[in-house]
C-alpha cells in the first residue's frame, strides 16, 4: 500500500488561521491581544532560526511579541530575574526560553522558574504532572501537535498498539502520556530496550523521536501502520531527513508524516495555541 501523507504544514496553517480569527475577535471586542515573550540567550545558529520562526508565527496571528535577546555572558541570576519580571507582567501570557542554554545555566532551574500558567512550552513539572494525572492544562507542544494531526485526519487511536521510540522529556515521555489519554496501549523504547525491531513490527502507531537519520528501516514497519517521524536531521549534502527511512516506510504504512513538513510545523502551531489558551483561561477570562 502507498501511505497517505499527513500534511503537517497545511494543518499547522489551519491551526494558526483559527487562532488568528480568535485574536481578531478579542481585539474587536475591546480585549487585548495575547502576549508572548521569547527569550534567547547567546547566538546558537539553530536556536536563532527556531526563535525567528516562533516570532514570525506570533506576528502572523496578531499576538504582541516581546523579544529578549541576551548575550552569551548572561548569568543564571540575570536570566532568573528576567523571568521573575515577565511572570509579574500582566500583558504577557506566555514565556518561552529557547533551549539549549549556555554552559553554567541550569536548564531545570530556569524552566521551573516560569509560572506554570505562562509555561507555553509545557515543560514545567506542574504541567507535566497535570498531563500524567489526566487533567492537562498547558501541554508540551510537539506531543500535543502530533495528537492534533491524528485528530485532524480522523484517525481513531482507541485500542491501537502505540510504540514511542525515544524517551526524552520534550517528546517521548509526554508523548506516552498523550497516547494513554488517546486510548492507546503504549510502549516507550529507549537505549536499553532489547529487540527494538520486535516492538516496531507490532506497532499500529509508531512515533519516532531519536534524532538519528534513517534509524528505523522501512522493512520493520507493520503493514498499515501509522508512522509519525519527529526527527529532523540535516545530512552532509544539506538534505533534511527524518529518523525513519521514508520511501521504504511509506510503501508499508497507511499514514506517514514527511520530513520536513510533518511534525515540525505543528510544534510552533501548538505553541501559538497554548499562548491563546493561557490568555483566555488563566489571565483574561472575560475573553471566553
Curated annotation (Swiss-Prot):
What UniProt keywords are attached to this protein's entry?
A: Amino-acid biosynthesis, Histidine biosynthesis, Hydrolase, Methionine biosynthesis, Multifunctional enzyme, NADP, One-carbon metabolism, Oxidoreductase, Purine biosynthesis
Any one GO cellular component localisation term in the record? cytosol
**What EC number(s) does its UniProt record assign?**
1.5.1.5, 3.5.4.9
Note the Gene3D superfamilies from the entry: Leucine Dehydrogenase, chain A, domain 1, NAD(P)-binding Rossmann-like Domain
Q: Which SUPFAM superfamilies match?
A: Aminoacid dehydrogenase-like, N-terminal domain, NAD(P)-binding Rossmann-fold domains
The highest taxon in the source lineage is Bacteria
GO MF annotations in UniProt: methenyltetrahydrofolate cyclohydrolase activity; methylenetetrahydrofolate dehydrogenase (NADP+) activity
Q: Name one GO biological process term.
A: purine nucleotide biosynthetic process
Its pathway, per UniProt, is:
One-carbon metabolism; tetrahydrofolate interconversion
Spell out the InterPro entries in the cross-references. Aminoacid_DH-like_N_sf, NAD(P)-bd_dom_sf, THF_DH/CycHdrlase, THF_DH/CycHdrlase_cat_dom, THF_DH/CycHdrlase_CS, THF_DH/CycHdrlase_NAD-bd_dom
Q: List the disulfide bonds.
A: none
Binding-site residues, NADP(+): 166-168, 232
Kindly indicate whether the keyword rRNA processing belongs to this entry: no
| Pfam families linked to this entry | THF_DHG_CYH, THF_DHG_CYH_C
| Reaction catalyzed | (6R)-5,10-methylene-5,6,7,8-tetrahydrofolate + NADP(+) = (6R)-5,10-methenyltetrahydrofolate + NADPH; (6R)-5,10-methenyltetrahydrofolate + H2O = (6R)-10-formyltetrahydrofolate + H(+)
* Subunit and partners: Homodimer.
User: Which family does the record claim for this protein?
Assistant: Belongs to the tetrahydrofolate dehydrogenase/cyclohydrolase family.
Which PANTHER family does the entry link to? C-1-TETRAHYDROFOLATE SYNTHASE, CYTOPLASMIC (PTHR48099:SF5), C-1-TETRAHYDROFOLATE SYNTHASE, CYTOPLASMIC-RELATED (PTHR48099)
The function of this protein is: Catalyzes the oxidation of 5,10-methylenetetrahydrofolate to 5,10-methenyltetrahydrofolate and then the hydrolysis of 5,10-methenyltetrahydrofolate to 10-formyltetrahydrofolate.
Q: Tell me what this protein is called.
A: Bifunctional protein FolD
Amino acid at each position: 500500500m502507498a501511505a497517505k501523507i499527513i500534511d503537517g504544514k497545511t494543518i499547522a496553517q489551519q491551526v494558526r488561521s483559527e487562532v488568528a480569527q480568535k485574536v481578531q475577535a478579542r481585539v474587536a471586542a475591546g480585549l487585548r491581544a495575547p502576549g508572548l515573550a521569547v527569550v534567547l540567550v547567546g547566538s546558537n545558529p539553530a536556536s536563532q532560526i527556531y526563535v525567528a520562526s516562533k516570532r514570525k508565527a506570533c506576528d502572523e496571528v496578531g499576538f504582541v511579541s516581546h523579544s529578549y535577546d541576551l548575550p552569551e555572558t548572561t548569568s543564571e541570576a540575570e536570566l532568573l530575574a528576567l523571568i521573575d519580571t515577565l511572570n509579574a507582567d500582566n500583558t504577557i501570557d506566555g514565556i518561552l526560553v529557547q533551549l539549549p542554554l549556555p554552559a553554567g545555566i541550569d536548564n531545570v532551574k530556569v524552566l521551573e522558574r516560569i509560572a506554570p500558567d505562562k509555561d507555553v512550552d509545557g515543560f514545567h513539572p506542574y504541567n507535566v504532572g497535570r498531563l500524567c494525572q489526566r487533567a492537562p492544562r498547558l501541554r508540551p507542544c510537539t506531543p500535543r501537535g502530533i495528537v492534533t494531526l491524528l485528530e485532524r485526519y480522523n484517525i481513531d487511536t482507541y485500542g491501537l498498539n502505540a510504540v514511542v521510540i525515544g524517551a526524552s522529556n520534550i517528546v517521548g515521555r509526554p508523548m506516552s502520556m498523550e497516547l494513554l489519554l488517546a486510548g492507546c496501549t503504549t510502549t516507550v523504547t529507549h537505549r536499553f530496550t532489547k529487540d527494538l525491531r520486535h516492538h516496531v513490527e507490532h506497532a499500529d502507531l509508531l512515533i519516532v523521536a531519536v534524532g538519528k537519520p534513517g534509524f528505523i528501516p522501512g522493512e520493520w514497519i507493520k503493514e498499515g501502520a501509522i508512522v509519525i517521524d519527529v526527527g529532523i536531521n540535516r545530512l552532509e549534502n544539506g538534505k533534511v531527513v527524518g529518523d525513519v527511512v521514508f520511501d521504504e516506510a511509506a510503501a508499508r504504512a497507511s499514514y506517514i508524516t514527511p520530513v520536513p513538513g510533518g511534525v515540525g510545523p505543528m510544534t510552533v502551531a501548538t505553541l501559538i495555541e497554548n499562548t491563546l489558551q493561557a490568555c483566555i483561561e488563566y489571565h483574561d477570562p472575560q475573553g471566553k
